[in-house]
């Protein structure tokens, strides 16, 4: 287990260095397979429950099997696996971009409910993934625009926010737990789709980069600069109301 944790730490460090390099140069990688591999590795890292869900469960005291039964993804929080596989490449990237906006808002709401290191690492992972999503969308559409090599700005999520907050702190904890479980499931599916791009290249006309360039696929908006999250000690407010301790 210690070796696996060390491996994840090294992978995270490598991905962070790649992100910093891209932002520093202001350019995206023009190599499709290299960029695709980075996206696959980032998705693999973000799907790991030990990066976010497990620290949340530990800190909130949700260890028991009975409570785990109620820590479930709510239908509609994230696009389904079937829906993701049906999307064209550009639509898939746009869906990832939109969903990352929801995840960033949720991370902001959970800032006081997660260990500081886990929260900062998760935020960095989402930003880096969003940066490479933009780079891939730019590569597929054949754009020469070098700007906006930045992570995604939080935008509209895939589903509306709940109209009313949960009736108790305990229910809010379970709701947040289910959201994080869904987040890891979503990233696992996203990684599978991205691996499918490499495995099926040359066989799928719909997912062909050349075809995407020829048909002038819909443009994914460049990612504007992301807002800085509120510092610890100044809670931004819960996604479903102010957290009650």
UniProtKB/Swiss-Prot annotation:
Q: Kindly provide the PTM information from the record.
A: Propeptide processing is not important for receptor binding activity but may be important growth-inhibitory activity.
Q: Which UniProt keywords apply?
A: Cleavage on pair of basic residues, Cytokine, Disulfide bond, Glycoprotein, Growth regulation, Secreted, Signal
Here the segments flagged for biased composition (Pro residues) are 153-166
Q: Name one GO cellular component term.
A: extracellular space
Q: Which InterPro entries match?
A: 4_helix_cytokine-like_core, Leukemia_IF/oncostatin, Leukemia_IF/oncostatin_CS, OSM
Localisation per UniProt entry: Secreted
In this UniProt entry, which cysteines form S-S bonds?
Answer: 28-135, 71-177
Q: What is its main location?
A: secreted
Signal peptide feature range? 1-26
- Known glycosylation sites: 97
Region labeled Disordered — which residues? Answer: 143-171, 197-245
Give the propeptide positions. 207-245
Biological processes, Gene Ontology terms: immune response; oncostatin-M-mediated signaling pathway; positive regulation of biosynthetic process; regulation of cell communication; regulation of signaling
Q: Which SUPFAM superfamilies match?
A: 4-helical cytokines (SSF47266)
Which Gene Ontology MF annotations are present?
cytokine activity; oncostatin-M receptor binding
Q: Supply the SMART domains for this chain.
A: LIF_OSM (SM00080)
| PANTHER family associated with the record | ONCOSTATIN M, ONCOSTATIN-M
For this chain, the family text in UniProt reads: Belongs to the LIF/OSM family.
What role does it play? Growth regulator. Inhibits the proliferation of a number of tumor cell lines. It regulates cytokine production, including IL-6, G-CSF and GM-CSF from endothelial cells. Uses both type I OSM receptor (heterodimers composed of LIFR and IL6ST) and type II OSM receptor (heterodimers composed of OSMR and IL6ST). Involved in the maturation of fetal hepatocytes, thereby promoting liver development and regeneration.
- Record's protein name: Oncostatin-M
């Amino acid at each position: 287990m210690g070796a696996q944790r060390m491996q994840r730490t090294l992978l995270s460090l490598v991905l962070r260095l790649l992100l910093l390099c891209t932002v520093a140069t202001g350019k995206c990688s023009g190599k499709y397979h290299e960029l695709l591999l980075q996206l696959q590795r980032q998705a693999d890292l973000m799907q790991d429950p030990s990066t976010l869900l497990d620290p949340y469960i530990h800190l909130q005291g949700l260890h028991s099997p009975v409570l785990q039964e109620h820590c479930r993804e709510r239908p509609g929080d994230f696009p389904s696996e079937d829906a993701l596989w049906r999307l064209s490449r550009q639509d898939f990237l746009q869906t990832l971009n939109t969903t990352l906006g929801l995840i960033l808002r949720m991370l902001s709401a959970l800032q006081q409910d997660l260990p500081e290191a886990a929260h900062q690492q998760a935020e960095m992972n989402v930003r880096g993934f969003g940066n490479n999503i933009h780079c891939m969308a730019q590569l597929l559409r054949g754009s020469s625009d070098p700007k906006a090599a930045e992570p995604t700005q939080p935008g509209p999520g895939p589903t509306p926010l709940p109209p009313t907050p949960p009736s108790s702190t305990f229910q809010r904890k379970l709701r947040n737990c289910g959201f994080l479980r869904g987040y890891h499931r979503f990233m696992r599916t996203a990684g599978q789709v991205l691996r499918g791009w490499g495995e099926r290249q040359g066989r799928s006309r719909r997912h062909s980069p050349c075809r995407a360039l020829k048909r002038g696929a819909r443009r994914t908006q460049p990612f504007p600069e992301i807002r800085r999250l509120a510092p610890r000690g100044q809670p931004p407010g819960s996604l479903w109301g102010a957290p009650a301790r």
